[in-house]
Amino acid sequence: MESNAHGRISGRIWFSAIFFGLIGQIAWIVENMYFATFAQDIFSNSGRADMAYLVTTLMVVFSALTATITTVIAGGLCDKAGKRKPFIAYGYIAWGFTIMLFALLPMSVTEANLALVATLLVVFDCIMTVAGSTSNDAAFNAWVADNTSPSNRGRVNSALSVLPVFAVVIVFIGLGSMYDPSAASNSTFFTSSVIIES
């Protein structure tokens, strides 16, 4: 496991913290801003707007439970392995692929497929949450603690705390125009979100 840094923070640590911190925030912003909208648009386009609220509620509930459980378990695995970097590097790649799962879903479905799509939305959201909670919430946050000390950790955390603002701007400018609720599919939107993150 990386030892705590003391005093001055190296450029490598700063770069890694900002780079992975921003990528993580972009991914979370895509989930927080578009996943619920995506689900609501699917059911509205399918003539079952009443299902949208149930499905989005289930997505929020199960995603929150998944995030809590995953962070605890993944944090323990990171500590046991004694390494953070593999969990971060490979975890972020997996995170991108799990976001792309949503590209497989159409924007309108038949009555016979409504239950299947509703289930897939919840499952895909949970899978994405497992990847994100492992790589970002558990491994990356622990890596920051490992590579900073009480005397300089505040500076890094302050920089990380403003990244969600930049992530919102990037998602709005880079992706907002690509999302079309009336399209047959929004695969371009979800695929492009992963490209921007990478």
Segments (PLM) and residue ranges:
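Transmembrane alpha-helix termini and helix-breaking/packing motifs in multi-pass membrane transporters
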Residues: 41, 110, 167-196
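Intracellular juxtamembrane helix-capping segments at the cytosolic ends
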Residues: 35, 133-149
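C-terminal ends and interior cores of transmembrane alpha-helices
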Residues: 90-115
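Helix-loop boundary and gating motifs at the non-cytosolic
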Residues: 2-65
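Loop-to-transmembrane helix entry/capping segments in MFS-fold secondary transporters
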Residues: 50-54, 150-160
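Central cavity-lining transmembrane alpha-helices of secondary-active solute carriers
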Residues: 53-78, 97-98, 172
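Glycine-rich segments within core transmembrane alpha-helices of 12-TM secondary carriers
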Residues: 63-68, 154-180
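Cytoplasmic membrane-interface "Motif A"-like loop-to-helix N-cap segments
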Residues: 79-94
